[in-house]
Swiss-Prot record:
Active site: 136, 191, 204
Flavoprotein among keywords: no
Protein name listed in UniProt: Cutinase 1
pH dependence of this protein's activity: Optimum pH is 8.
Length: 230
């Protein structure tokens, strides 16, 4: 009954408000592809020094959604297109609204999908520095998958950025089993999902400025702390 009520609430919210900001969608298209599969399509002979794995928000297009392309663009500017792979979470992660109401804020299949990408990155490119991110349901997904990772792989994730973190209250602004100083949570004032609700208000759709500046800056800083400034 509780799951049905929450799913109904999410559906009603979706009908009342857009699930993304049209300006952010336009910017994402202008920056380039909203789908990136560099890790999946790459091979071990062409590994990059940095691999960014990102989970989009509910109902967003591609596998990077509205915020991912901005972060990707900044990372490529910092490290060069030959220095970083960009990988969105697709496959079994459907980014459907109803999955927000599940206990971990997303589906078990989605968590396995993102776990598999981290594991693939570790196997294919064991010397790469990993960074991660997610928005809304994707933030919950990133947190859950990092929490569940083998510690040896989790230790390779230099930094993670979360926007509109739907498990922010429950996880006390952190990712369980992961260092707080490697985590940057962006929660706008008035974003109700950050305070334990699944109601989407306007501030939840306004993380574009963070994705263009503070978030990639945080990730770049964390990578350089590991690999140096080169």
């Amino acid at each position: 009954m509780k799951f049905f009520a929450l799913t109904t609430l999410l559906a009603a919210t979706a009908s009342a408000l857009p699930t993304s900001n049209p300006a952010q969608e336009l910017e994402a298209r202008q920056l380039g592809r909203t789908t990136r599969d560099d890790l999946i399509n790459g091979n071990s002979a062409s590994c990059r020094d940095v691999i960014f794995i990102y989970a989009r928000g509910s109902t967003e297009t591609g596998n990077l959604g509205t915020l991912g392309p901005s972060i990707a663009s900044n990372l490529e500017s910092a490290f060069g297109k030959d220095g970083v792979w960009i990988q969105g979470v697709g496959g079994a992660y459907r980014a459907t609204l109803g999955d927000n109401a599940l206990p971990r804020g997303t589906s078990s299949a989605a968590i396995r999908e993102m776990l598999g990408l981290f594991q693939q990155a570790n196997t294919k490119c064991p010397d790469a520095t990993l960074i991660a991110g997610g928005y809304s349901q994707g933030a919950a997904l990133a947190a859950a998958s990092i929490e569940d990772l083998d510690s040896a792989i989790r230790d390779k994730i230099a930094g993670t950025v979360l926007f509109g973190y739907t498990k922010n209250l429950q996880n006390r602004g952190r990712i369980p089993n992961y260092p707080a100083d490697r985590t940057k949570v962006f929660c706008n004032t008035g974003d109700l999902v950050c305070t334990g609700s699944l109601i989407v208000a306007a501030p939840h759709l306004a993380y574009g400025p963070d994705a263009r500046g503070p978030a990639p800056e945080f990730l770049i800083e964390k990578v350089r702390a590991v690999r140096g400034s080169a």
